[in-house]
């Protein structure tokens, strides 16, 4: 869901469109190659997003080192990503810190929940995505990323 939201926000912003590439991958390989969960797609549809995400991918060392910024959903993901990175210039950001700075809270995984939990997760992802695109606009003119 985060990929779809962020792709949408970047595409809508002329200062970012064509300059920021959005991809996504998981820190575990459970769902590699699988399409998006139907409940996630439903939440995106209800919110008016076109859910054209790519099949699930795995965030291995090669994948991660090719990115400037990696946005993680949980503290465990931050740890996993940092363990795999060899490119130390890649910045790892906990998404929820963009919405609630300094609290170091995870984005709750709605996988075992109902539609309401997917909708709540999507709302958080939208807020984080808006903050992230704001940071990207600033970053394109600066060397630091605040999160």
Predicted regions and their residues:
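Short polar/charged helix/loop
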Residues: 1-147
């Amino acid at each position: 869901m985060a990929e779809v939201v962020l792709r949408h926000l970047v595409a809508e912003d002329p200062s970012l469109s064509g300059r920021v590439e959005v991809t996504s991958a998981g820190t575990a390989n459970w769902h590699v190659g699988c399409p998006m969960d139907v409940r996630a797609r439903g939440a995106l549809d209800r919110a008016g997003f076109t859910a054209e995400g790519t099949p699930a991918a795995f965030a291995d060392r090669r994948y991660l080192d090719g990115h400037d910024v990696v946005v993680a959903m949980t503290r465990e993901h931050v740890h996993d990503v940092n363990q795999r990175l060899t490119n130390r210039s890649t910045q790892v950001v906990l998404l929820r810190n963009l919405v609630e700075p300094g609290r170091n809270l995870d984005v709750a995984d709605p996988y075992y929940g109902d539609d309401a939990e997917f909708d709540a997760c999507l709302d958080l992802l939208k807020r984080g995505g808006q903050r992230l695109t704001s940071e990207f606009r600033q970053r394109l003119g600066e060397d630091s990323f605040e999160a």
